[in-house]
Amino acid sequence: MDKSSGELVTLTPNNNNTVQPVALMRLGVFVPTLKSLKNSKKNTLSRTDATEELTRLSLARAEGFDKVEITGPRLDMDNDFKTWVGIIHSFARHNVIGDKVELPFVEFAKLCGIPSSQSSRSLRERISPSLKRIAGTVISFSRTDEKHTREYITHLVQSAYYDTERDIVQLQADPRLFELYQFDRKVLLQLKAINALKRRESAQALYTFIESLPRDPAPISLARLRARLNLKSPVFSQNQTVRRAMEQLREIGYLDYTEIQRGRTKFFCIHYRRPRLKAPNDESKENPLPPSPAEKVSPEMAEKLALLEKLGITLDDLEKLFKSR
């Protein structure tokens, strides 16, 4: 629904865009690859609290689940995200029979952004590990009281089968999660920016997060962007990664921004977003906003803000805490 006009807008995926559930974009399910050898050899099991976003699903509402957690291998942007895009496209474009969709393997590879010129072996080496990681990602819905616990455990994708000799792919989804694939709070994610950011996974991840935000978003804290990337390096190094990624997004023409400081906290003010990487005919529609003036903060408040940042507590975390009370 377009809030400005009241018109119902249908979002349809094609080769240049995909419909991505907002929850998966904001939560950081898909993150940059851990580059260092030290980090890459660590246990890369990822655990994400998805309660705020996914308790809106009818499954959670019907069963009264009040906690949702996503657990599984760390999903990267360069391969796993593109495979997930292919899965979304497959269910959107092909006839779903029961809980399964079937299509040619070569077409599925194309939907994942893999050139058809690659050999069958190369296709397998890229798609197979990604399908295993995505199918290995668990979503658990639960509710616990003083005496009892109820829990429903499922997967991002229930099963995947392919046969390159027969040129076939079969994907199976949990019917109770079809709503996640067709979430009513979704945005049309342009793939043009993703393609322009090849091998720049941090910029790709921040793009999926920023593109999921509403129009004229509030300033985004540096800490929030660090959390979205879910890196394991020291904070100062993570800050450098975030700033470099933001600059890469500006270089491809996706956005413009200003970095400001309020007290001890750094923020990014987004002036405009251009997922098509070109200016619209009427640039006034972008409503560029000037950066908000820095607020005067007392020394006592500055100390409190510094302590929160040191503990890794963001303003978003505080807002969630107050809402839950």
Curated annotation (Swiss-Prot):
Entry annotated with the keyword Cell inner membrane: no
InterPro entries: Initiator_Rep_WH1, WH-like_DNA-bd_sf
UniProt-listed GO biological process terms: DNA replication initiation; plasmid maintenance
Cleavable signal peptide: none
Keyword DNA-binding in annotation: yes
Function: This protein is essential for plasmid replication; it is involved in copy control functions. In vitro, binds to the DNA repeat units, BCDD'D'', EFG and HIJ.
Entry similarity comment: Belongs to the initiator RepB protein family.
GO molecular function per UniProt: DNA binding; DNA-directed DNA polymerase activity
Annotated keywords: DNA replication, DNA-binding, Plasmid, Plasmid copy control
Protein name: RepFIB replication protein A
Superkingdom of the organism of origin: Bacteria
Region (Disordered): 279-298
